[in-house]
Amino acid sequence: KIEKYRKSVSLEAIAERGYDAAVQSTDEEFKSDLTNVVSDRFYAQLKAGSLVGHESTWQMAFAMAIGKVVNKFQEMKRTATGVAVWVNTLDVYKYLGAADITVQTAFGFKYMKNFMGADVVFMTSQIPEGVVIATPLNNMVAYYVDPGDSEFAKAGLQYTTDPTTGFIGFHVQGTYERAISDMFAIMGLRLFCEYLDAIAYISVGDSDTQTL
């Protein structure tokens, strides 16, 4: 499914700050809003995982989250091709202290590779502190439509693909009737997990903390 959005920059804002500053500010805010649409849906599903439990330490919660999803796939007669883990950013730095880590970014998600037995670890404030979420890599599915598709251009709808995210297409044009600059965006990315019962939600502490 392709989703369509529009955001405008007023003539007054351009006159006050200049075209480049006014449009760049709106562009970044627009891009952030659209990225959040994708991530919010995905995180809502991750937080609904049914492999729930709790452990006394963050390190144990991390290990058990991995163990539970690998074990679940084995019970399903499937083989996990790897494991992705989601944690709160502050928990990572509390655990590591001053140690150097290499953090990469893709599609607006910050992540590390090959950390504590996980193939990929995503760091985000969307995950509560003291919670570790995990799922096999091959439990995740992505549907993607290229916003720069030449078929759109043939229809007179030419979009420039945002180089940072890779999944948002932008087009800007002036609208004289309203004296504004309209920014149009299309987005065709959906991330989801095929099996909710292959998502682990492990809390640190004396009890489970998942709320649905």
Tell me the role of every PLM-derived stretch.
Residues E55-P136:
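Long, positively charged binding patches that form subdomain-scale interaction surfaces
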Residues K1-R78, D91-Y93, F170-L212:
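Flexible, glycine/threonine- and acidic-rich loop/arm segments that mediate assembly and lattice contacts
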Residues A106-L212:
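Sequence/fold signature of self-assembling virion shell proteins
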Residues S8, W86, Y143:
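Residues in well-ordered beta-strands of folded domains
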